[in-house]
Amino acid sequence: MNHLPDFIEHFEPLAQNYDVLLCDVWGVIHNGVTAFAPACDALLRFRKRGGTAVLVTNAPRPGEAVARILDRLAVPRQAYDTITSSGDTTRGIVASRRGQRLFHLGPERDVPIFAGLELTFAPLETADYVVCSGLFDDTVETPETYRDMLAAMRQRSLFMVCANPDIMVERGDALVYCAGALADAYVALGGDVLYCGKPHAPIYQAALAAAAAARGAATVPLERVLAIGDSVRTDLTGAAAFGIDSVFVTSGIHAEEYGGRHTPDIEALDGIFAAGGVTPIAVTRGLKW
């Protein structure tokens, strides 16, 4: 068994080693239904001590739209400096393809991702490319539901922009599929996909630029940056590839893979890290000061 990172109950002793926190949102700060008060408190305290907290999310929405969702969940805006979303990255890609017709594969609630952009929507049969923000109805559908649609896209060699690389997220006590699941299925068919969000570099570049701006600095030393998240595939892999330390939250989407949310199976947890090729500096049940 590989060396397992320290299991910590409190973030405070670790916080002094870092100036910038790149914090995941869904699964760390809330579960889609309820905000996690201890996590919000930890962010508030980190900022009070001079730290900069950037929320980095694969939500397929502009950062301000994410902020409004957090408002409704009672996450205080004082808990973070700014938000960097895969939705913002996606908007940049769409803007660069002005004049091309796009098919939006995703629910109506994600339409704000296109607000203010000059674009032309088209049905799949005549579109030039696809922006995938999720399943049309993630409460009942799975990637299998989209087998025929993805095959039709592949037949036309349509390029896909994936606005949310997450495979699944928590919604209350349930797990629902995200755009990343459809994008991966399309790649398996030989389709061409651009992933906007974690674990890919552009969103980290944007987040670090936002952190530097918030601190009034030109850059932020990577050794003073810490990422916190509940996904090995996105949060930990992305941080490792960018040379950033990470803390893994066990109460998120991987919980059932290692014995539940309260008493993780250490060997199973170590196996998940080994399979992902990552080694977080610490593991915690939840972000708590």
PLM region descriptions:
Residues 1-25, 30-49, 56-84, 88-289:
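Asp-based, Mg2+/Mn2+-dependent phosphohydrolase catalytic module
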